[in-house]
Every structure is written in C-alpha cells, then in structure tokens.
Amino acid sequence: AIDRAVDITWKEKSWMSDNVPAVRLEHVAMPSETAMERAANSDMAWSTQPVFVYAEIESYLKNLTESTVKASYPVAKWLDMGIRTSLSSDAPATSWAAPSDPFVNLKSAVTRKAWDGTDTGQEHRIDIETAIRLYTAEAGPFVGFTDVGILKPGYAADFIILDRDILDIPSDEIDQVKVLETWI
C-alpha cells in the first residue's frame, strides 16, 4: 500500500508553506527501494512508528521472516537518503500497555530492540538527539505547524521537564523516563 501511495503522489508539490510537505504518509514500515528513492526525490514526508515492532514482536516474527522484521522501519536509512521522516506513537493502535507514551517509541528507534530484547535491526538505529528531533522539530511541519519543536525566538515556547537527562542515560532506560512538568 505504501509503494502504491508513493507511486501515485511522489511528484506532487507543496501547496502550503515551503516547509510543509505536499504529501504525508502514515504507518510507513516496509517500503520498497523504489519507493524510498522516489520519496527521497520528492516533496513527501513519512511518519513512522517503530514502537509497533517493539511491542508486537511475536506477531511480526510469526508472520514475517527475521530479515524482513530487521529491515522494517529503517529510519536511519531513510534519513541518510534524505527522506523527511517523523516519529509518532499512533496511540492507541498498538497493544502496548501505554500506547501514547513517546519514550517507548524513542527507545525502539534508538535501540532497535523489541521489549523482549529481540534484535529488530541494529543497522537502523538512530541516536537519541535525532529521535527527539523527529518527534518535535521535524513532526510539526508535517501537519502545518512551522513554529513548534524548537526553543528559539518566534516559536512556541512549550517544553517539558523530565525526571532525568534523557541525553545522558543508557538507551535501555529511555522508556523509564517520566515527565515531571509540562510548560505551555
């Protein structure tokens, strides 16, 4: 389905501001090489949820080959190719206990391990700074919000205070981070 959507829309041009993509595709998980090449050369953006393979690894391994599972949600590859990408939780679409918790998805993108430790494609890991950017500064323009996600003059000054420094903890602990305060 993703390949078909890319095939139909990859030549579209943005009709909004310069930073808002012409097309945003959701649930991008396993696109073909052709779809990735077209997306990289288009005004398209992809929103993805590596939390699905993290939370539902048993189903993935039951229905797909191990190599297909490891090739799914290749966020690092997409970024290297120049594909505009954001992360989202897509709550409540996963069976995970707290589907709207962004820290589980951040952990999944950074560690590329499922909840049970299964390797879900180490070559597609991204660092925590990149993962946070894909949830904030990159995600806003995907829906037309071009003044959010960065603390700088002219932008909305919304921010959160966490119970620990997410940039300085072991990646296996990212899902344990808690929000202490939200400032809007």
Ranges and model annotations:
Residues V6-V23, H27-V28, E33-E37, N41-M44, ...:
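His/Asp/Glu-enriched, well-ordered alpha-helical/loop segment
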